[in-house]
């Protein structure tokens, strides 16, 4: 066996005396803190929102609570293809599929439907991957942002609750 030649690629940056003692970093952090203090205390710009009297304004890209869409005839869009369940990194979605029988054919456009559809908001990380994976455009994260509750069962969304979050059935695409 021969010897291996090692070549040093990166050279180490020589720290100056003030970088060694972190005076520069401490001063930089104190300057940021001082700027925020001046804005809040002297200029009287408030940072805190008086919740629940005042509501926060959300951007158009805000990911709120999950909602399920219906098509133009008012039928459920979800065909229980399990795409959202498989792609969910937090494993927060549970779907149980059912076969469409003639009695409920008018409610579902396909042969299969979601008999049980649950999202556990305690596990959900609101990444939006379920929304992107849905081929039918059935699930969206455009619901309300306030989800505070004192009951853990309220944080498990069922299909029925997702369809009535914004005051009744939701028809059409995202605005």
Curated annotation (Swiss-Prot):
Any matching Pfam family: Fer4
Keyword check for Protein biosynthesis: no
Enzymatic reactions: a quinone + NADH + 5 H(+)(in) = a quinol + NAD(+) + 4 H(+)(out)
Topology versus the membrane: Peripheral membrane protein
Cofactor note text: Binds 2 [4Fe-4S] clusters per subunit.
GO MF terms, alphabetically ordered: 4 iron, 4 sulfur cluster binding; iron ion binding; NADH:ubiquinone reductase (non-electrogenic) activity; quinone binding
UniProt GO cellular component terms: plasma membrane
Annotated residues for binding of [4Fe-4S] cluster 2: 88, 124, 127, 130
Keywords assigned by UniProt, alphabetized: 4Fe-4S, Cell inner membrane, Cell membrane, Iron, Iron-sulfur, Membrane, Metal-binding, NAD, Quinone, Repeat, Translocase, Ubiquinone
EC number: 7.1.1.-
Enzyme's top EC category: translocase
Residues reported to bind [4Fe-4S] cluster 1: 78, 81, 84, 134
Positions of the 4Fe-4S ferredoxin-type domain: 69-98, 115-144
Described function: NDH-1 shuttles electrons from NADH, via FMN and iron-sulfur (Fe-S) centers, to quinones in the respiratory chain. The immediate electron acceptor for the enzyme in this species is believed to be ubiquinone. Couples the redox reaction to proton translocation (for every two electrons transferred, four hydrogen ions are translocated across the cytoplasmic membrane), and thus conserves the redox energy in a proton gradient.
Family: Belongs to the complex I 23 kDa subunit family.
The name this protein goes by in its record: NADH-quinone oxidoreductase subunit I
Record organism: Leptospira borgpetersenii serovar Hardjo-bovis (strain L550)
Lineage: Bacteria, Pseudomonadati, Spirochaetota, Spirochaetia, Leptospirales
């Amino acid at each position: 066996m021969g010897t291996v030649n090692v070549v040093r690629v990166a050279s180490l940056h020589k720290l100056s005396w003030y970088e060694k003692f972190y005076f520069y970093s401490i001063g930089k952090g104190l300057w940021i803190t001082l700027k925020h203090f001046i804005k809040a205390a002297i200029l009287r710009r408030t940072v805190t929102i008086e919740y629940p009297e005042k509501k926060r304004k959300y951007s158009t890209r805000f990911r709120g609570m999950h909602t399920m869409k219906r098509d133009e005839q008012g039928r459920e869009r979800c065909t229980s293809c399990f795409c959202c369940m498989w792609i969910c990194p937090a494993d927060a979605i549970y779907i149980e599929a059912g076969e469409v029988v003639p009695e409920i054919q008018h409610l579902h456009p396909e042969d299969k439907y979601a008999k049980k559809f649950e999202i556990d908001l305690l596990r959900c990380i609101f990444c939006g991957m379920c929304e992107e994976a849905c081929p039918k455009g059935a699930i969206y994260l455009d619901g309300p942002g306030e989800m505070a509750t004192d009951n853990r069962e309220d944080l498990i969304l069922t299909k029925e609750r997702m369809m009535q979050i914004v005051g009744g059935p939701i028809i059409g695409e995202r605005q």
